[in-house]
UniProtKB/Swiss-Prot annotation:
GO terms for molecular function: cytidine deaminase activity; RNA binding; zinc ion binding. Keywords: Antiviral defense, Cytoplasm, Hydrolase, Immunity, Innate immunity, Metal-binding, Nucleus, Phosphoprotein, Repeat, Zinc. The CMP/dCMP deaminase domain 1 mediates RNA binding, RNA-dependent oligomerization and virion incorporation whereas the CMP/dCMP deaminase domain 2 confers deoxycytidine deaminase activity and substrate sequence specificity. GO terms for cellular component: cytoplasm; nucleus; P-body; ribonucleoprotein complex. Its main location: cytoplasm. The modification Phosphothreonine is found at residues 32, 218. This is DNA dC->dU-editing enzyme APOBEC-3G. Zn(2+) 2 binds at residues 257, 288, 291. SUPFAM superfamilies: Cytidine deaminase-like (SSF53927). Belongs to the cytidine and deoxycytidylate deaminase family. Homodimer. Homooligomer. Can bind RNA to form ribonucleoprotein complexes of high-molecular-mass (HMM) or low-molecular-mass (LMM). HMM is inactive and heterogeneous in protein composition because of binding nonselectively to cellular RNAs, which in turn are associated with variety of cellular proteins. The LMM form which is enzymatically active has few or no RNAs associated. Its ability to form homooligomer is distinct from its ability to assemble into HMM. Interacts with APOBEC3B, APOBEC3F, MOV10, AGO2, EIF4E, EIF4ENIF1, DCP2 and DDX6 in an RNA-dependent manner.
Length: 384
């Protein structure tokens, strides 16, 4: 008997959307994949030519997956419009499985006039190395057209609610922890796709001038090593960068600091309790008091993880922030100021430098020395 859901539909019920697009990273009993699509010709402000929904079962035959249903429909429709360039957008409850991911990459390679943007509510089998490699192959840009994959944020959920749900003019009501789950998934996807930072973003935010204005974001680059027989083994799959989520960014009312976003994602790494790990963070600002307290709690409760922090600048080194740094150091964290060596390492490791070597800015070493002195005074409780 063939699975149902063969033909596309135009809208879904509110409960169906909320249940299937719920973005908690680990979720069971969601075996139906919902794919909302929009097709339009390339160009600014072009309205969609078609917008409907395909459904399919996760464990059914590949041809019954909604991604394959879409391409079966689109291929027939495309024959009538062979010379036109199209932009396709998917909003999908699960990211495509490994086989669908490879077939999508093949389709796009064979039809360079089609671009695809995929917004996913959740990542399917994100811990599997074969799946990670398939996603990287789909999203790489260097040898031909590929897809762009992003995690659905509040704006995409709101768009789907308005476009594909029988909303009866009711406003979309986000569920609890939607912003937190988005941040977690965004970080995990960045790890998988090995996102890199733009050079201007790095040089602007990590510049270590003693007094800077307008640097309200905190960037945090991280890498993880497993300690074994007095040697360190770098875990390449546990490396990436993130920044704080400012209030109202992506439609979320509340913000979240970069350090807390980082602590949120560590449990999903499933680090072996019987192994010892070293986590190294390179931050544009040292942690604030609250973040330092939370990081201290984390390393106190996770004895198999040691924490090393290199900061480009010291955040508000007066009062409670000084106390927070001392608490963090007392808990066992190593806190240092970034020098030329760390800036170069971050440039080489986390920046899309296109082969250009790191160029230090004027005063880098002098600023590092001055900040190191201030940090030593703080940690020794000597003030300025």
């Amino acid at each position: 008997m063939k699975p149902h859901f063969r033909n596309p539909v135009e809208r879904m019920y509110q409960d169906t959307f909320s249940d299937n697009f719920y973005n908690r990273p680990i979720l069971s009993r969601r075996n139906t994949v919902w794919l909302c699509y929009e097709v339009k010709t390339k160009g600014p402000s072009r309205p969609p030519l078609d917008a409907k929904i395909f459904r399919g079962q996760v464990y059914s035959k590949l041809k019954y997956h909604p991604e394959m249903r879409f391409f079966h429909w689109f291929s027939k429709w495309r024959k009538l419009h062979r010379d036109q360039e199209y932009e396709v957008t998917w909003y999908i409850s699960w990211s495509p499985c490994t086989k669908c991911t490879r077939d999508v990459a093949t389709f796009l390679a064979e039809d360079p006039k089609v671009t695809l943007t995929i917004f996913v509510a959740r990542l399917y089998y994100f811990w599997d190395p074969d799946y990670q490699e398939a996603l990287r192959s789909l999203c790489q840009k260097r040898d031909g057209p590929r897809a762009t994959m992003k995690i659905m944020n509040y704006d995409e959920f709101q768009h789907c609610w308005s476009k594909f749900v029988y909303s009866q003019r009711e406003l979309f009501e986000p569920w609890n922890n939607l912003p937190k789950y988005y941040i977690l998934l965004h970080i995990m996807l960045g790890e998988i796709l090995r996102h890199s930072m733009d050079p201007p973003t790095f040089t602007s935010n990590f510049n270590n001038e003693l007094w800077v204005r307008g640097r309200h974001e905190t960037y945090l680059c991280y890498e993880v090593e497993r300690l074994h027989n007095d040697t360190r083994v770098l875990l390449n799959q546990r490396r990436g960068f993130l920044c704080n989520q400012a209030p109202h960014k992506h439609g979320f009312l509340e913000g979240r600091h970069a350090e807390l976003c980082f602590l949120d994602v560590i449990p999903f790494w499933k680090l072996d309790l019987h192994q010892d790990y070293r986590v190294t963070c390179f931050t544009s600002w040292s942690p604030c008091f609250s973040c330092a307290q939370e990081m201290a709690k984390f390393i106190s409760n996770n004895k198999h993880v040691s924490l090393c922090i290199f900061a480009a600048r010291i955040y508000d080194d007066q009062g409670r922030c000084q106390e927070g740094l001392r608490t963090l150091a007392k808990a066992g964290a190593e806190i240092s100021i970034m020098t030329y060596s760390e800036f170069k390492h971050c440039w080489d490791t986390f920046v899309d430098h296109q082969g250009c070597p790191f160029q230090p800015w004027d005063g880098l070493e002098e600023h590092s020395q001055a900040l190191s002195g201030r940090l030593r005074a703080i940690l020794q409780n000597q003030g300025n």
